[in-house]
Protein backbone atom coordinates (compact mmCIF):
# COMPACT_ATOMS: atom_id res chain seq x y z
CA UNK A 1 0.00 0.00 0.00
CA UNK A 2 1.33 3.44 -0.92
CA UNK A 3 1.63 5.68 2.17
CA UNK A 4 3.08 9.14 1.89
CA UNK A 5 5.10 10.80 4.64
CA UNK A 6 3.23 12.60 7.42
CA UNK A 7 4.59 15.96 6.28
CA UNK A 8 2.82 15.59 2.93
CA UNK A 9 -0.43 14.56 4.52
CA UNK A 10 -1.12 17.34 6.97
CA UNK A 11 -4.67 18.60 7.05
CA UNK A 12 -3.13 22.10 7.01
CA UNK A 13 -1.93 21.37 3.46
CA UNK A 14 -5.37 20.12 2.43
CA UNK A 15 -8.02 22.66 3.17
CA UNK A 16 -11.38 20.89 3.24
CA UNK A 17 -14.44 22.13 1.42
CA UNK A 18 -17.09 22.20 4.14
CA UNK A 19 -20.86 22.40 3.83
CA UNK A 20 -23.48 23.14 6.43
CA UNK A 21 -25.74 20.34 7.62
CA UNK A 22 -28.68 21.24 5.32
CA UNK A 23 -26.39 21.31 2.29
CA UNK A 24 -24.88 17.96 3.27
CA UNK A 25 -28.34 16.42 3.47
CA UNK A 26 -29.30 17.85 0.08
CA UNK A 27 -26.11 16.49 -1.48
CA UNK A 28 -26.74 13.12 0.16
CA UNK A 29 -30.26 13.07 -1.28
CA UNK A 30 -28.90 13.87 -4.75
CA UNK A 31 -26.34 11.07 -4.47
CA UNK A 32 -29.03 8.68 -3.24
CA UNK A 33 -31.36 9.62 -6.10
CA UNK A 34 -28.60 8.90 -8.62
CA UNK A 35 -27.88 5.56 -6.97
CA UNK A 36 -31.59 4.76 -6.86
CA UNK A 37 -31.79 5.33 -10.61
CA UNK A 38 -28.92 2.86 -10.99
CA UNK A 39 -30.42 0.19 -8.73
CA UNK A 40 -33.88 0.40 -10.36
CA UNK A 41 -35.48 -2.46 -12.28
CA UNK A 42 -35.19 -0.23 -15.36
CA UNK A 43 -31.98 1.66 -14.52
CA UNK A 44 -30.38 4.74 -16.01
CA UNK A 45 -26.84 3.73 -16.94
CA UNK A 46 -25.33 7.20 -16.48
CA UNK A 47 -26.63 7.81 -12.95
CA UNK A 48 -24.12 5.70 -10.93
CA UNK A 49 -21.21 7.39 -12.71
CA UNK A 50 -22.26 10.73 -11.20
CA UNK A 51 -23.31 9.55 -7.74
CA UNK A 52 -19.87 9.67 -6.04
CA UNK A 53 -19.49 13.41 -6.71
CA UNK A 54 -22.29 14.73 -4.45
CA UNK A 55 -21.69 11.85 -2.03
CA UNK A 56 -18.04 12.72 -1.40
CA UNK A 57 -18.76 16.44 -1.33
CA UNK A 58 -21.36 15.84 1.38
CA UNK A 59 -18.96 13.58 3.29
CA UNK A 60 -16.07 16.04 3.43
CA UNK A 61 -15.34 17.80 6.67
CA UNK A 62 -15.74 15.26 9.47
CA UNK A 63 -16.50 11.67 10.32
CA UNK A 64 -20.03 12.67 11.26
CA UNK A 65 -20.51 14.28 7.85
CA UNK A 66 -19.34 11.09 6.13
CA UNK A 67 -21.72 8.93 8.15
CA UNK A 68 -24.61 11.30 7.47
CA UNK A 69 -23.90 11.42 3.74
CA UNK A 70 -23.59 7.65 3.45
CA UNK A 71 -26.73 7.05 5.50
CA UNK A 72 -28.88 9.50 3.55
CA UNK A 73 -27.59 8.24 0.19
CA UNK A 74 -28.04 4.60 1.17
CA UNK A 75 -31.60 5.16 2.39
CA UNK A 76 -32.62 7.01 -0.77
CA UNK A 77 -30.81 4.49 -3.00
CA UNK A 78 -33.13 1.64 -2.05
CA UNK A 79 -36.39 3.53 -2.66
CA UNK A 80 -36.72 2.54 -6.33
CA UNK A 81 -36.85 -1.14 -5.35
CA UNK A 82 -39.00 -0.91 -2.22
CA UNK A 83 -42.35 -1.82 -3.86
CA UNK A 84 -40.73 -4.75 -5.64
CA UNK A 85 -39.02 -6.01 -2.48
CA UNK A 86 -42.21 -5.70 -0.44
CA UNK A 87 -44.16 -7.79 -2.95
CA UNK A 88 -41.41 -10.34 -3.43
CA UNK A 89 -39.90 -10.87 0.03
CA UNK A 90 -42.19 -9.08 2.51
CA UNK A 91 -41.61 -6.47 5.21
CA UNK A 92 -39.12 -8.21 7.54
CA UNK A 93 -36.60 -9.14 4.85
CA UNK A 94 -37.11 -5.81 3.07
CA UNK A 95 -36.25 -3.99 6.29
CA UNK A 96 -33.10 -6.07 6.61
CA UNK A 97 -32.15 -5.25 3.01
CA UNK A 98 -32.66 -1.53 3.66
CA UNK A 99 -30.54 -1.61 6.83
CA UNK A 100 -27.75 -3.50 5.07
CA UNK A 101 -27.83 -1.11 2.11
CA UNK A 102 -27.67 1.92 4.40
CA UNK A 103 -24.90 0.38 6.50
CA UNK A 104 -22.91 -0.51 3.40
CA UNK A 105 -22.93 3.03 2.06
CA UNK A 106 -22.12 4.49 5.48
CA UNK A 107 -19.10 2.19 5.71
CA UNK A 108 -17.92 2.84 2.15
CA UNK A 109 -18.36 6.61 2.41
CA UNK A 110 -16.69 6.86 5.81
CA UNK A 111 -13.73 4.78 4.69
CA UNK A 112 -13.32 6.83 1.53
CA UNK A 113 -13.47 10.13 3.39
CA UNK A 114 -11.02 8.97 6.05
CA UNK A 115 -8.61 7.81 3.35
CA UNK A 116 -8.47 11.30 1.86
CA UNK A 117 -6.83 12.56 5.06
CA UNK A 118 -4.03 10.01 4.99
CA UNK A 119 -3.42 8.95 1.39
CA UNK A 120 -2.41 10.65 -1.86
CA UNK A 121 -5.28 11.45 -4.22
CA UNK A 122 -4.22 8.72 -6.68
CA UNK A 123 -4.69 6.12 -3.93
CA UNK A 124 -7.61 7.69 -2.07
CA UNK A 125 -9.78 7.79 -5.19
CA UNK A 126 -9.64 3.97 -5.35
CA UNK A 127 -11.16 3.51 -1.91
CA UNK A 128 -14.84 4.18 -2.62
CA UNK A 129 -14.98 2.05 -5.81
CA UNK A 130 -12.94 -0.72 -4.20
CA UNK A 131 -15.00 -0.78 -1.00
CA UNK A 132 -18.34 -0.87 -2.82
CA UNK A 133 -16.97 -3.63 -5.08
CA UNK A 134 -15.94 -5.57 -1.97
CA UNK A 135 -19.39 -5.18 -0.43
CA UNK A 136 -21.04 -6.31 -3.67
CA UNK A 137 -18.86 -9.43 -3.69
CA UNK A 138 -19.73 -10.33 -0.10
CA UNK A 139 -23.40 -9.78 -0.93
CA UNK A 140 -23.42 -12.09 -3.94
CA UNK A 141 -21.57 -14.76 -1.93
CA UNK A 142 -23.90 -14.83 1.10
CA UNK A 143 -27.24 -13.75 -0.39
CA UNK A 144 -29.68 -16.47 -1.53
CA UNK A 145 -30.48 -14.11 -4.40
CA UNK A 146 -26.89 -14.10 -5.65
CA UNK A 147 -25.97 -10.89 -7.47
CA UNK A 148 -29.58 -9.77 -7.91
CA UNK A 149 -29.89 -6.09 -7.03
CA UNK A 150 -26.31 -5.27 -7.98
CA UNK A 151 -25.44 -1.82 -9.29
CA UNK A 152 -23.51 -3.55 -12.08
CA UNK A 153 -26.71 -4.31 -14.01
CA UNK A 154 -27.27 -0.59 -14.51
CA UNK A 155 -24.66 -0.81 -17.26
CA UNK A 156 -26.28 -3.50 -19.38
CA UNK A 157 -27.28 -0.91 -21.98
CA UNK A 158 -23.63 0.22 -22.13
CA UNK A 159 -22.27 -3.00 -23.56
CA UNK A 160 -18.71 -1.70 -23.82
CA UNK A 161 -18.57 -0.97 -20.09
CA UNK A 162 -19.63 -4.42 -18.92
CA UNK A 163 -16.91 -6.21 -20.89
CA UNK A 164 -14.68 -5.84 -17.82
CA UNK A 165 -16.92 -8.49 -16.22
CA UNK A 166 -14.97 -10.99 -18.32
CA UNK A 167 -11.95 -9.99 -16.21
CA UNK A 168 -13.38 -9.52 -12.73
CA UNK A 169 -17.12 -10.16 -12.73
CA UNK A 170 -19.62 -7.91 -10.99
CA UNK A 171 -16.99 -6.24 -8.73
CA UNK A 172 -14.97 -5.11 -11.75
CA UNK A 173 -18.00 -3.40 -13.28
CA UNK A 174 -18.80 -1.67 -9.98
CA UNK A 175 -15.21 -0.49 -9.60
CA UNK A 176 -15.10 0.93 -13.11
CA UNK A 177 -18.34 2.91 -12.97
CA UNK A 178 -17.58 4.53 -9.59
CA UNK A 179 -13.96 5.42 -10.40
CA UNK A 180 -14.38 8.68 -12.39
CA UNK A 181 -16.95 10.06 -9.95
CA UNK A 182 -14.66 9.25 -7.06
CA UNK A 183 -11.86 11.24 -8.69
CA UNK A 184 -14.17 14.18 -9.39
CA UNK A 185 -15.63 14.19 -5.89
CA UNK A 186 -12.29 14.06 -4.10
CA UNK A 187 -10.78 16.56 -6.55
CA UNK A 188 -13.30 19.16 -5.39
CA UNK A 189 -13.18 18.47 -1.67
CA UNK A 190 -9.55 19.32 -0.92
CA UNK A 191 -6.71 21.54 -2.01
CA UNK A 192 -4.53 18.76 -3.40
CA UNK A 193 -1.02 19.41 -4.59
CA UNK A 194 -0.57 19.77 -8.33
CA UNK A 195 1.55 16.60 -8.45
CA UNK A 196 -1.19 14.66 -6.65
CA UNK A 197 -3.76 15.78 -9.20
CA UNK A 198 -1.54 14.83 -12.14
CA UNK A 199 -0.85 11.39 -10.68
CA UNK A 200 -4.56 10.78 -10.10
CA UNK A 201 -5.49 11.88 -13.62
CA UNK A 202 -2.78 9.66 -15.08
CA UNK A 203 -3.98 6.63 -13.10
CA UNK A 204 -7.65 7.03 -14.04
CA UNK A 205 -6.69 7.74 -17.64
CA UNK A 206 -4.59 4.58 -17.87
CA UNK A 207 -7.33 2.44 -16.33
CA UNK A 208 -9.94 3.94 -18.67
CA UNK A 209 -7.68 3.36 -21.68
CA UNK A 210 -7.03 -0.24 -20.67
CA UNK A 211 -10.75 -0.92 -20.18
CA UNK A 212 -11.58 0.70 -23.52
CA UNK A 213 -8.96 -1.26 -25.45
CA UNK A 214 -10.07 -4.52 -23.86
CA UNK A 215 -13.72 -3.82 -24.70
CA UNK A 216 -12.94 -2.87 -28.29
CA UNK A 217 -10.83 -6.00 -28.76
CA UNK A 218 -13.48 -8.28 -27.26
CA UNK A 219 -16.43 -6.78 -29.11
CA UNK A 220 -14.60 -7.00 -32.44
CA UNK A 221 -13.44 -10.61 -32.03
CA UNK A 222 -15.92 -12.31 -34.34
CA UNK A 223 -16.49 -16.07 -33.93
CA UNK A 224 -15.85 -18.10 -37.05
CA UNK A 225 -17.67 -21.07 -38.51
CA UNK A 226 -21.30 -22.12 -38.65
CA UNK A 227 -24.08 -21.10 -36.28
CA UNK A 228 -26.82 -22.95 -34.41
CA UNK A 229 -30.43 -21.88 -35.14
CA UNK A 230 -32.43 -21.23 -31.99
CA UNK A 231 -36.20 -20.89 -31.59
CA UNK A 232 -37.61 -19.32 -28.41
CA UNK A 233 -41.27 -19.94 -27.61
CA UNK A 234 -43.38 -18.69 -24.68
CA UNK A 235 -46.86 -17.51 -23.73
CA UNK A 236 -48.49 -15.88 -20.71
CA UNK A 237 -51.78 -17.64 -21.49
CA UNK A 238 -51.65 -19.83 -18.38
CA UNK A 239 -52.00 -18.50 -14.83
CA UNK A 240 -49.60 -19.87 -12.25
CA UNK A 241 -48.48 -23.47 -12.70
CA UNK A 242 -51.08 -25.62 -14.51
CA UNK A 243 -51.84 -28.93 -12.78
CA UNK A 244 -51.76 -31.02 -15.94
CA UNK A 245 -49.63 -31.49 -19.03
CA UNK A 246 -52.06 -32.19 -21.85
CA UNK A 247 -53.64 -28.73 -22.05
CA UNK A 248 -50.27 -27.01 -21.89
CA UNK A 249 -48.69 -29.21 -24.54
CA UNK A 250 -51.72 -28.86 -26.80
CA UNK A 251 -50.94 -25.14 -26.93
CA UNK A 252 -47.15 -25.39 -27.25
CA UNK A 253 -46.78 -28.39 -29.54
CA UNK A 254 -48.10 -26.76 -32.75
CA UNK A 255 -45.72 -23.83 -32.27
CA UNK A 256 -42.79 -26.19 -31.71
CA UNK A 257 -43.57 -28.27 -34.79
CA UNK A 258 -44.12 -25.20 -36.98
CA UNK A 259 -41.09 -23.16 -35.95
CA UNK A 260 -38.31 -25.62 -35.05
CA UNK A 261 -35.30 -25.85 -37.36
CA UNK A 262 -33.62 -29.19 -38.01
CA UNK A 263 -30.27 -29.25 -36.26
CA UNK A 264 -31.29 -26.37 -34.01
CA UNK A 265 -32.59 -25.67 -30.52
CA UNK A 266 -36.08 -24.93 -29.20
CA UNK A 267 -36.32 -23.39 -25.72
CA UNK A 268 -39.60 -23.24 -23.79
CA UNK A 269 -40.17 -21.57 -20.39
CA UNK A 270 -39.84 -22.79 -16.80
CA UNK A 271 -42.69 -24.49 -14.89
CA UNK A 272 -44.97 -25.21 -17.82
CA UNK A 273 -46.90 -27.56 -15.53
CA UNK A 274 -46.83 -29.34 -12.15
CA UNK A 275 -46.61 -33.08 -12.79
CA UNK A 276 -46.30 -36.27 -10.81
CA UNK A 277 -43.75 -38.89 -11.82
CA UNK A 278 -46.12 -40.49 -14.30
CA UNK A 279 -47.05 -37.13 -15.82
CA UNK A 280 -43.38 -36.21 -16.10
CA UNK A 281 -42.80 -39.42 -18.02
CA UNK A 282 -45.60 -38.57 -20.46
CA UNK A 283 -44.20 -35.05 -20.87
CA UNK A 284 -40.77 -36.48 -21.66
CA UNK A 285 -42.33 -38.75 -24.28
CA UNK A 286 -44.23 -35.90 -25.93
CA UNK A 287 -41.23 -33.58 -26.01
CA UNK A 288 -39.02 -36.39 -27.33
CA UNK A 289 -41.51 -37.09 -30.11
CA UNK A 290 -41.45 -33.41 -31.07
CA UNK A 291 -37.64 -33.46 -31.10
CA UNK A 292 -37.60 -36.51 -33.36
CA UNK A 293 -40.26 -35.05 -35.67
CA UNK A 294 -38.46 -31.73 -36.11
CA UNK A 295 -34.84 -32.83 -35.85
CA UNK A 296 -34.30 -30.15 -33.19
CA UNK A 297 -33.29 -30.30 -29.54
CA UNK A 298 -36.26 -29.23 -27.38
CA UNK A 299 -35.86 -27.89 -23.84
CA UNK A 300 -38.82 -27.32 -21.49
CA UNK A 301 -39.25 -26.60 -17.79
CA UNK A 302 -41.68 -28.46 -15.49
CA UNK A 303 -42.17 -28.89 -11.76
CA UNK A 304 -42.18 -32.56 -10.75
CA UNK A 305 -43.68 -34.11 -7.62
CA UNK A 306 -42.19 -37.44 -6.59
CA UNK A 307 -44.25 -38.60 -3.60
CA UNK A 308 -43.74 -35.78 -1.08
CA UNK A 309 -40.71 -34.21 -2.78
CA UNK A 310 -40.87 -31.45 -5.40
CA UNK A 311 -38.26 -30.56 -8.01
CA UNK A 312 -37.99 -27.66 -10.42
CA UNK A 313 -36.65 -29.33 -13.53
CA UNK A 314 -35.68 -28.74 -17.12
CA UNK A 315 -36.18 -31.49 -19.66
CA UNK A 316 -33.96 -31.73 -22.73
CA UNK A 317 -35.02 -34.09 -25.52
CA UNK A 318 -32.76 -34.78 -28.50
CA UNK A 319 -33.67 -36.09 -31.96
CA UNK A 320 -31.60 -39.23 -31.29
CA UNK A 321 -33.93 -40.20 -28.44
CA UNK A 322 -31.83 -38.96 -25.54
CA UNK A 323 -33.71 -37.39 -22.62
CA UNK A 324 -31.77 -35.40 -20.02
CA UNK A 325 -33.12 -33.85 -16.81
CA UNK A 326 -31.63 -30.93 -14.88
CA UNK A 327 -32.65 -29.82 -11.36
CA UNK A 328 -32.62 -26.09 -10.61
CA UNK A 329 -29.83 -25.30 -8.15
CA UNK A 330 -30.82 -21.88 -6.77
CA UNK A 331 -34.45 -21.61 -5.67
CA UNK A 332 -36.34 -18.35 -5.02
CA UNK A 333 -36.78 -17.93 -1.23
CA UNK A 334 -40.43 -17.69 -0.24
CA UNK A 335 -41.65 -18.85 -3.66
CA UNK A 336 -39.99 -22.22 -4.17
CA UNK A 337 -39.55 -23.41 -0.60
CA UNK A 338 -41.26 -26.72 -1.33
CA UNK A 339 -38.75 -27.60 -4.06
CA UNK A 340 -35.55 -29.53 -3.47
CA UNK A 341 -32.53 -27.88 -5.13
CA UNK A 342 -30.16 -29.63 -7.47
CA UNK A 343 -26.45 -29.67 -6.78
CA UNK A 344 -24.66 -30.04 -10.11
CA UNK A 345 -24.46 -28.49 -13.58
CA UNK A 346 -25.57 -30.51 -16.60
CA UNK A 347 -23.78 -30.49 -19.97
CA UNK A 348 -25.06 -32.05 -23.18
CA UNK A 349 -22.89 -32.57 -26.28
CA UNK A 350 -25.17 -32.11 -29.27
CA UNK A 351 -25.75 -30.07 -32.49
CA UNK A 352 -22.01 -29.63 -32.91
CA UNK A 353 -21.56 -27.85 -29.61
CA UNK A 354 -21.79 -28.33 -25.86
CA UNK A 355 -24.93 -27.08 -24.17
CA UNK A 356 -25.31 -26.09 -20.55
CA UNK A 357 -28.71 -26.15 -18.86
CA UNK A 358 -29.79 -23.67 -16.18
CA UNK A 359 -33.15 -22.44 -14.91
CA UNK A 360 -34.00 -18.77 -14.29
CA UNK A 361 -32.65 -17.97 -10.78
CA UNK A 362 -29.54 -20.06 -11.40
CA UNK A 363 -28.29 -17.36 -13.72
CA UNK A 364 -28.66 -14.66 -11.07
CA UNK A 365 -25.80 -16.38 -9.24
CA UNK A 366 -22.31 -15.80 -10.69
CA UNK A 367 -20.95 -18.93 -9.02
CA UNK A 368 -23.49 -21.13 -10.84
CA UNK A 369 -22.95 -19.30 -14.10
CA UNK A 370 -19.22 -19.92 -13.75
CA UNK A 371 -19.76 -23.68 -13.33
CA UNK A 372 -20.35 -23.72 -17.08
CA UNK A 373 -17.38 -21.53 -18.03
CA UNK A 374 -14.93 -23.25 -20.34
CA UNK A 375 -17.36 -26.14 -20.85
CA UNK A 376 -20.64 -24.94 -22.32
CA UNK A 377 -20.62 -22.73 -25.39
CA UNK A 378 -24.40 -22.17 -25.39
CA UNK A 379 -26.60 -21.94 -22.29
CA UNK A 380 -30.29 -22.83 -22.59
CA UNK A 381 -32.37 -21.20 -19.85
CA UNK A 382 -36.08 -21.81 -19.26
CA UNK A 383 -37.34 -19.01 -16.99
CA UNK A 384 -40.40 -17.61 -15.21
CA UNK A 385 -40.22 -13.91 -14.29
CA UNK A 386 -42.50 -11.69 -12.21
CA UNK A 387 -43.49 -9.34 -15.02
CA UNK A 388 -42.18 -6.09 -13.60
CA UNK A 389 -38.64 -7.52 -13.38
CA UNK A 390 -38.62 -8.90 -16.93
CA UNK A 391 -35.89 -6.54 -18.15
CA UNK A 392 -33.72 -7.11 -15.09
CA UNK A 393 -34.16 -10.88 -15.15
CA UNK A 394 -33.00 -10.99 -18.75
CA UNK A 395 -30.03 -8.69 -18.11
CA UNK A 396 -28.78 -10.64 -15.11
CA UNK A 397 -28.60 -13.69 -17.36
CA UNK A 398 -26.96 -11.58 -20.05
CA UNK A 399 -24.14 -10.56 -17.71
CA UNK A 400 -23.36 -14.24 -17.05
CA UNK A 401 -22.71 -14.54 -20.80
CA UNK A 402 -20.19 -11.70 -20.62
CA UNK A 403 -18.48 -13.11 -17.54
CA UNK A 404 -18.05 -16.61 -18.91
CA UNK A 405 -17.86 -16.28 -22.68
CA UNK A 406 -20.86 -18.35 -23.75
CA UNK A 407 -24.01 -17.53 -25.69
CA UNK A 408 -27.43 -17.69 -24.00
CA UNK A 409 -30.91 -18.64 -25.20
CA UNK A 410 -33.56 -17.71 -22.60
CA UNK A 411 -37.32 -18.18 -22.76
CA UNK A 412 -39.35 -16.67 -19.90
CA UNK A 413 -43.00 -16.64 -18.93
CA UNK A 414 -44.01 -13.13 -17.80
CA UNK A 415 -40.73 -11.92 -19.23
CA UNK A 416 -38.78 -11.84 -22.48
CA UNK A 417 -37.74 -14.40 -25.04
CA UNK A 418 -34.15 -13.41 -25.75
CA UNK A 419 -30.80 -14.54 -27.07
CA UNK A 420 -27.34 -13.06 -26.35
CA UNK A 421 -23.93 -13.69 -27.80
CA UNK A 422 -20.81 -14.36 -25.75
CA UNK A 423 -20.13 -10.63 -25.28
CA UNK A 424 -23.64 -9.92 -24.05
CA UNK A 425 -24.92 -8.29 -27.23
CA UNK A 426 -28.65 -8.74 -27.72
CA UNK A 427 -29.34 -10.84 -30.81
CA UNK A 428 -33.09 -10.95 -30.35
CA UNK A 429 -35.46 -9.91 -27.58
CA UNK A 430 -39.24 -9.67 -27.39
CA UNK A 431 -41.71 -9.36 -24.51
CA UNK A 432 -43.95 -12.39 -24.03
CA UNK A 433 -47.73 -11.87 -24.37
CA UNK A 434 -50.85 -14.00 -23.90
CA UNK A 435 -50.47 -15.09 -27.52
CA UNK A 436 -47.78 -17.56 -28.46
CA UNK A 437 -44.57 -15.53 -28.78
CA UNK A 438 -42.02 -17.05 -31.15
CA UNK A 439 -38.63 -15.60 -32.12
CA UNK A 440 -35.58 -17.06 -33.81
CA UNK A 441 -31.86 -16.33 -33.64
CA UNK A 442 -28.53 -17.87 -34.62
CA UNK A 443 -25.91 -18.54 -31.95
CA UNK A 444 -22.25 -19.33 -32.39
CA UNK A 445 -21.30 -22.81 -31.16
CA UNK A 446 -17.86 -21.46 -30.21
CA UNK A 447 -17.32 -19.98 -26.77
CA UNK A 448 -14.51 -17.73 -25.59
CA UNK A 449 -12.55 -18.46 -22.43
CA UNK A 450 -12.45 -15.56 -19.97
CA UNK A 451 -10.20 -14.65 -17.07
CA UNK A 452 -13.22 -14.52 -14.79
CA UNK A 453 -14.37 -17.94 -15.95
CA UNK A 454 -10.97 -19.42 -15.07
CA UNK A 455 -10.15 -17.55 -11.86
CA UNK A 456 -13.48 -16.40 -10.47
CA UNK A 457 -13.75 -13.45 -8.11
CA UNK A 458 -10.04 -12.89 -7.50
CA UNK A 459 -10.46 -9.16 -8.13
CA UNK A 460 -13.42 -8.94 -5.77
CA UNK A 461 -11.62 -10.77 -2.99
CA UNK A 462 -8.61 -8.50 -3.43
CA UNK A 463 -10.98 -5.56 -2.89
CA UNK A 464 -12.31 -7.23 0.27
CA UNK A 465 -8.82 -7.82 1.67
CA UNK A 466 -7.63 -4.29 0.89
CA UNK A 467 -10.77 -2.72 2.37
CA UNK A 468 -10.31 -4.69 5.59
CA UNK A 469 -6.61 -3.85 5.80
CA UNK A 470 -7.30 -0.19 5.14
CA UNK A 471 -9.98 -0.08 7.81
CA UNK A 472 -7.65 -1.68 10.35
CA UNK A 473 -4.82 0.67 9.42
CA UNK A 474 -7.00 3.76 9.62
CA UNK A 475 -8.20 2.64 13.02
CA UNK A 476 -4.63 2.48 14.31
CA UNK A 477 -3.42 5.81 12.93
CA UNK A 478 -4.30 9.03 14.73
CA UNK A 479 -6.35 11.63 12.84
CA UNK A 480 -5.29 14.08 11.68
CA UNK A 481 -1.59 13.71 11.00
CA UNK A 482 0.53 16.58 12.25
CA UNK A 483 3.76 17.55 10.59
CA UNK A 484 6.83 17.62 12.78
CA UNK A 485 6.73 21.44 12.78
CA UNK A 486 3.11 21.39 13.90
CA UNK A 487 3.99 18.90 16.64
CA UNK A 488 6.78 21.21 17.82
CA UNK A 489 4.39 24.15 17.78
CA UNK A 490 1.91 22.17 19.83
CA UNK A 491 4.60 21.32 22.42
CA UNK A 492 5.74 24.95 22.64
CA UNK A 493 2.17 26.11 23.11
CA UNK A 494 1.71 23.54 25.84
CA UNK A 495 4.73 24.94 27.69
Give the location of each predicted region:
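CN hydrolase (nitrilase-like) catalytic-core segments centered on the catalytic cysteine
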Residues: 265, 279-299, 306, 353-354, ...
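Non-cytosolic juxtamembrane linkers/loops
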Residues: 206-260, 389-392, 399-400, 409, ...
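Juxtamembrane interface at the cytosolic side of transmembrane helices
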Residues: 469-495
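Active-site catalytic loop in hydrolytic enzyme cores
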Residues: 86-93, 138-170, 293, 309-370, ...
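Soluble catalytic regions of membrane-associated enzymes that act on cell-envelope
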Residues: 217-334, 348
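Membrane-embedded alpha-helical bundles of multi-pass enzymes
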Residues: 2-219, 387, 420-423, 427, ...
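Active-site beta-strand/loop signature of hydrolases that rely on acidic residues for catalysis
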Residues: 43, 81-85, 136, 230, ...
Amino acid sequence: MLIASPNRLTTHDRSTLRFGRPAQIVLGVIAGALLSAGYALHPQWWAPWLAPVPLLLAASGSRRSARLAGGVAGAIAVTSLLPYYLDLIGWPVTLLVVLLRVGSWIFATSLADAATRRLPLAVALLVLPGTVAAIELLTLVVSPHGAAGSLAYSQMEAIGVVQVAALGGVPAVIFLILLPGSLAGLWLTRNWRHSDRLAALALVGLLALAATLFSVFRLNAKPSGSTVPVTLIATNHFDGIPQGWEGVWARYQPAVIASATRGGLVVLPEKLALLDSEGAGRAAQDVAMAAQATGAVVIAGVEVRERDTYYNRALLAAPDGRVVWYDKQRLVPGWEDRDTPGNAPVFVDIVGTRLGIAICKDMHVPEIGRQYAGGATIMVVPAYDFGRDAWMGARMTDLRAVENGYAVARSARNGFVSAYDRTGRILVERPVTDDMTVVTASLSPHGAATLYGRNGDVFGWCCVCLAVLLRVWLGRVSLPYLSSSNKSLSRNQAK
